[in-house]
Amino acid sequence: MAETFLFTSESVNEGHPDKLCDQISDAVLDACLEQDPESKVACETCTKTNLVMVFGEITTKANVDYEKIVRDTCRNIGFISNDVGLDADNCKVLVNIEQQSPDIAQGVHGHLTKRPEEIGAGDQGHMFGYATDETPELMPLSHVLATKLGARLTEVRKNGTCSWLRPDGKTQVTVEYYNDKGAMVPVRVHTVLISTQHDETVTNDEIAADLKEHVIKPVIPEKYLDEKTIFHLNPSGRFVIGGPHGDAGLTGRKIIIDTYGGWGAHGGGAFSGKDPTKVDRSGAYIVRQAAKSIVASELARRCIVQVSYAIGVPEPLSVFVDTYGTGKIPDKEILKIVKENFDFRPGMISINLDLKRGGNSRFLKTAAYGHFGREDPDFTWEVVKPLKWEKA
């Protein structure tokens, strides 16, 4: 058999302090967009023991109760007492929000006077989209499994299957792969790591048994597990203190978990708390759709797309495509197809992916368990676009 290699991806679940902050920032964005789709939002959140602070620049006609959003989001995650790491109803909430800088406003959207195709990028930057044919979601298996384990931890906590669970937790999966002429083929799961917050009464043996039975078994397909698979289940021994009590949290600290689990590449810009004029978010969404559509149309088995911007300029500065040698046609042809089928101007991304629509917890849903590879009609960038091109 071909030579194999190991690759690892991690995830954290919704009670992790950094992810709590992402969710609060996106809950604020949802509330603003729901009432005023033209809202300009750059909302950061930080948290530590008994404190949540929301700060940033927001220009909106929406009437938003920031403190209520903070408390509701914390409560829905399960932070209902100091024992679990934060008490949603009694913690201190600080709000320090100002309007968007008029300098940025005139340069980007001309104080709302520009037509959609004229709207400039909200900042400079470069974003990457990635897709691979190794899973039905066209996402890396290591990332998919780590993410699903985290989501399952939350599910069995909330439905009472494992009542000893507390909100905070982390997962990590190492997959053995072989490289099939540039495409990634998973062979087996090499290692599964879960560290989850738990209550005082449960024993380590109970934790390990429950995690295997109720979390790992339903998530990881049997064909990937064998007698050599290594399990590290709460390897530190105790994880009673968690959430913001255990560690400080900050929006935008989990950008690899939000994307491709270390595969592909990342331009460094976080997503949560940003409206669609911020290309960190909208640019990353459109290049995911481009890469996914290339792989779904079987033009390549694996694909990365990069786009870059200058502040105030609508047209991208560059678009790049690499299929890692898996393309059915040369990469320069695929690049042409990408440019012909996708409009990378921020105002047009907003329209084509319907990104100004808030409410329905739309962006809040993206803020835990990944922005990509999700089957949900609100994740419009996951829709495969039928590609049109001149076949030579």
From Swiss-Prot:
<feature type="binding site" description="in other chain">
    <location>
        <position position="247"/>
    </location>
    <ligand>
        <name>ATP</name>
    </ligand>
</feature>
<dbReference type="GO" id="GO:0006730">
    <property type="term" value="P:one-carbon metabolic process"/>
</dbReference>
<feature type="binding site" description="in other chain">
    <location>
        <begin position="168"/>
        <end position="170"/>
    </location>
    <ligand>
        <name>ATP</name>
    </ligand>
</feature>
<dbReference type="GO" id="GO:0005737">
    <property type="term" value="C:cytoplasm"/>
</dbReference>
<keyword id="KW-0460">Magnesium</keyword>
<keyword id="KW-0808">Transferase</keyword>
<dbReference type="InterPro" id="IPR022631">
    <property type="entry name" value="ADOMET_SYNTHASE_CS"/>
</dbReference>
<feature type="binding site" description="in other chain">
    <location>
        <position position="100"/>
    </location>
    <ligand>
        <name>L-methionine</name>
    </ligand>
</feature>
<dbReference type="InterPro" id="IPR022629">
    <property type="entry name" value="S-AdoMet_synt_central"/>
</dbReference>
<dbReference type="InterPro" id="IPR022636">
    <property type="entry name" value="S-AdoMet_synthetase_sfam"/>
</dbReference>
<keyword id="KW-0067">ATP-binding</keyword>
<feature type="binding site">
    <location>
        <position position="270"/>
    </location>
    <ligand>
        <name>ATP</name>
    </ligand>
</feature>
<dbReference type="InterPro" id="IPR022628">
    <property type="entry name" value="S-AdoMet_synt_N"/>
</dbReference>
<keyword id="KW-0554">One-carbon metabolism</keyword>
<feature type="binding site">
    <location>
        <position position="44"/>
    </location>
    <ligand>
        <name>K(+)</name>
    </ligand>
</feature>
<feature type="binding site">
    <location>
        <position position="10"/>
    </location>
    <ligand>
        <name>Mg(2+)</name>
    </ligand>
</feature>
<dbReference type="Pfam" id="PF02772">
    <property type="entry name" value="S-AdoMet_synt_M"/>
</dbReference>
<feature type="binding site">
    <location>
        <position position="278"/>
    </location>
    <ligand>
        <name>ATP</name>
    </ligand>
</feature>
<feature type="binding site" description="in other chain">
    <location>
        <position position="278"/>
    </location>
    <ligand>
        <name>L-methionine</name>
    </ligand>
</feature>
<comment type="function">
    <text>Catalyzes the formation of S-adenosylmethionine from methionine and ATP. The reaction comprises two steps that are both catalyzed by the same enzyme: formation of S-adenosylmethionine (AdoMet) and triphosphate, and subsequent hydrolysis of the triphosphate.</text>
</comment>
<keyword id="KW-0170">Cobalt</keyword>
<protein>
    <recommendedName>
        <fullName>S-adenosylmethionine synthase</fullName>
        <ecNumber>2.5.1.6</ecNumber>
    </recommendedName>
</protein>
<keyword id="KW-0630">Potassium</keyword>
<dbReference type="GO" id="GO:0006556">
    <property type="term" value="P:S-adenosylmethionine biosynthetic process"/>
</dbReference>
<dbReference type="Pfam" id="PF00438">
    <property type="entry name" value="S-AdoMet_synt_N"/>
</dbReference>
<dbReference type="GO" id="GO:0046872">
    <property type="term" value="F:metal ion binding"/>
</dbReference>
<comment type="subunit">
    <text>Homotetramer.</text>
</comment>
<dbReference type="InterPro" id="IPR022630">
    <property type="entry name" value="S-AdoMet_synt_C"/>
</dbReference>
<keyword id="KW-0479">Metal-binding</keyword>
<feature type="binding site" description="in other chain">
    <location>
        <begin position="253"/>
        <end position="254"/>
    </location>
    <ligand>
        <name>ATP</name>
    </ligand>
</feature>
<feature type="binding site" description="in other chain">
    <location>
        <begin position="236"/>
        <end position="239"/>
    </location>
    <ligand>
        <name>ATP</name>
    </ligand>
</feature>
<dbReference type="Pfam" id="PF02773">
    <property type="entry name" value="S-AdoMet_synt_C"/>
</dbReference>
<feature type="binding site">
    <location>
        <position position="247"/>
    </location>
    <ligand>
        <name>L-methionine</name>
    </ligand>
</feature>
<feature type="binding site">
    <location>
        <position position="274"/>
    </location>
    <ligand>
        <name>ATP</name>
    </ligand>
</feature>
<dbReference type="InterPro" id="IPR002133">
    <property type="entry name" value="S-AdoMet_synthetase"/>
</dbReference>
<dbReference type="GO" id="GO:0005524">
    <property type="term" value="F:ATP binding"/>
</dbReference>
<keyword id="KW-0963">Cytoplasm</keyword>
<feature type="binding site" description="in other chain">
    <location>
        <position position="57"/>
    </location>
    <ligand>
        <name>L-methionine</name>
    </ligand>
</feature>
<feature type="binding site" description="in other chain">
    <location>
        <position position="16"/>
    </location>
    <ligand>
        <name>ATP</name>
    </ligand>
</feature>
<comment type="similarity">
    <text>Belongs to the AdoMet synthase family.</text>
</comment>
<comment type="pathway">
    <text>Amino-acid biosynthesis; S-adenosyl-L-methionine biosynthesis; S-adenosyl-L-methionine from L-methionine: step 1/1.</text>
</comment>
<keyword id="KW-0547">Nucleotide-binding</keyword>
